Amino acid sequence: MSEADVRLAAEVIQARAAGRHLLLLTDFDGTLCEFHTDPAAVWLAPSRRALLEEIASDPRATLAIVSGRRLEDVRRRTMLGPDTYFAGLHGLEIEGGGDRFRHPAFDRSEALLRSLAEPIASDLAALDGTFLENKGPSLVAHFRAASVEDGARAEAVLLRHARPHLDASALRTMRGAFMLELMPNIEWHKGCAVNWIRDHVVKQYGDAWPLYIGDDLTDEDGFRAVRGDGLSVAASPRAGDADFAVDGPREVESLLRVVTRQLTKSGEVR
């Protein structure tokens, strides 16, 4: 067992010994799954799905997937059941535990971003290794497969088309790994999604001990949301605001095995 495994095991044991309900929140791309130049090619590995299903079905735990993808997209790619919470578009849409949330900005921003999608996509088509992903309430310029120069040009394309709306504070940008996202200018992010889910889990179980795992800049808000009352793990060498870091999805899978073992060893069900 690695040092990271040992530390997580100790934290889980301590939380369970205090009789707390485990709330596992995890990102998808780069955390549960390896990155791919084509987002449509990413699916959850069966071995990792089995571990997550074991956690989700345990009455001592609740599982939540917090992703920048559309909610239905990440649900389809994980193939996890109704016991799991899903937060899509960095929390603009959330479902789970019989509850649903859709931020008012979700519908307001779609028409504006739709008008920008075609000209941005047309300009990106001239840059090798770049493409535009239209999520509805957000647009993402991807450049993982591009040269450094074309990646910078892709960012410039997005910013040029969006500039009037950025200056008017109607839209904002969010950076991630080899991507730049254009989205509604609202104070809502993965940390807000974590708080929303935690509040609903607390209503059901009376308590929740949050464990957040993520790999990207967009996960920093999630790390901060659990600070002081939970544990955060960066699935990349860059720990950022996380409590500690592991090296990618393979080590995340190892951590999930630790969690399932500790749940099996834990005491009374809450």
Descriptions of predicted regions:
Residues 2-6, 19, 193-270:
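Mg2+-dependent phosphoryl-transfer enzymes with acidic/Ser/Thr/Gly-rich catalytic loops
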